[in-house]
Amino acid sequence: MADDGEADRDLARLVVLCVGRLEETGDPWEPCRLLDAGGSVVVPVSEFLAELQAQDSSVSTLRSYGNDLLLWWRWLAAAGVAWDKVTPAEGRDFARWMQVADKPARPHWRDRVGSPPGVSRGPVTAGPAAVTVNPVTGKASPGRKFSASSRAHAETVLRRFYDFRLESGRGPIMNPFPLDRSRRRGRAHAHRNPLEPFAHERTGRYRPRQPRRIPRRIPDEQFDQIFAGLKSHRDRALLAFWVSTGARAEELLDSVQDDVRPGDQLIAVTRKGSRAVQELPASPDAFVWLRLYQEEIWRKGAPRGRRHPLWFTLRRPFRPLAYPAARAMFTRAQQLLGTNWSIHDLRHTGAWRMARDPEMSLTDVQWVLGHAHLSTTQLYTTPDQNEVIASALAHHERRARRGPASSPPPPAAGYNPDSLGVLFGRPS
């Protein structure tokens, strides 16, 4: 509960401006740093990111945590509260704001060029007014509201940040994002039966409940149409590798030229979580498209060598292909079809194809996908939404062909069917 003496905060009128920014330095000692509205480094966040780096967190994790802390700093600036003066009342209001308010509109990158540090100028861009479902794919598009997964991630990040500050003795005397009240009775899973699986227990008090999502695959006919619309051998090779290996997008984009072994049909990737190098089998056509792409780009003067990146931009100067550029390529390829599949859906598609192969065991699929638990791989054995819809429509069609059910004949001559219906409760 919030303190009785706290000042009322009108969240409906709270305007969160896009002040401050998260800067990627390229320095391995400090990959990311948070800058406030005046362009100064936020030291408490830098210390927290250094702690995460010491815990062997990847650069993408530091970037993800930094973005949530940037949103929190912007919200505190709008609320007029210092980061070390917050209470659970601010944590509660922040959770309510993320649940109800629209996302802060971000200015276009062209309008940010030449602006002072931490200050945005020019018009702002906002997403669609409401979540819409794509009529072709059935996937919901992002709206102006924060998703439940984004809110849950922000709650986890901020709770860990203030736990770190409490351990160092520099910060508020209590965490503004406390644990759920049920956790006060003892540790989690204290009385669990060892013969039963772990049950999900609520962690944070302001952590939202997330719906269980079933992975969505791209139907074969839509994948073929997207593949036919690609403009370059590089893009064809990328899609062929993504869908045949089941690798994550950035795992494949981080590969170097020495990671490819065409003779064995293997390509090495660095796993997202464990950072372990794993060789993955790929389809033969993926290596054909890769060779065509390499010969084409090498003739244009792209770097060639064992330790050079495998994927480059198609125009000079040749730079390593980054995830935003690959995502833009995949989005452009779907414009004519009107679909909104993501690159990660290619991983789901490859996993679904392997899991549905009767001659491939589920443990083999788990190894290829790099899942820590077999239960995660089992998600791909659930019926696909398109298959369930087709099966239900076929059921209705069969019932329509059979026509209305004929009334049973009377048990013997002389019985009135209406009287039998009244006696036995059947409709007349």
Where are these regions (language model features)?
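Short, basic (Lys/Arg/His-rich) helix/loop patches that form interaction surfaces
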Residues: 327-367
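N-terminal core-binding DNA-recognition domain of tyrosine recombinases/integrases
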Residues: 46-61, 70-195, 225
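Conserved tyrosine-mediated DNA breakage-rejoining catalytic core shared by Y-recombinases
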Residues: 245, 250, 254-288
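Basic, Lys/Arg- and aromatic-enriched nucleic-acid-binding interface segment
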Residues: 210-249
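C-terminal secondary-structure termini that scaffold catalytic or DNA-interacting sites
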Residues: 3-6, 395-428
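C-terminal catalytic core of Y-nucleophile DNA break-rejoin enzymes
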Residues: 273-292, 307-329
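Catalytic-site neighborhood detector that most strongly recognizes the C-terminal catalytic loop/helix
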Residues: 271, 369-397
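Flexible interdomain linker/hinge and immediately adjacent N-terminus
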Residues: 92, 171-225, 270-273, 313-318
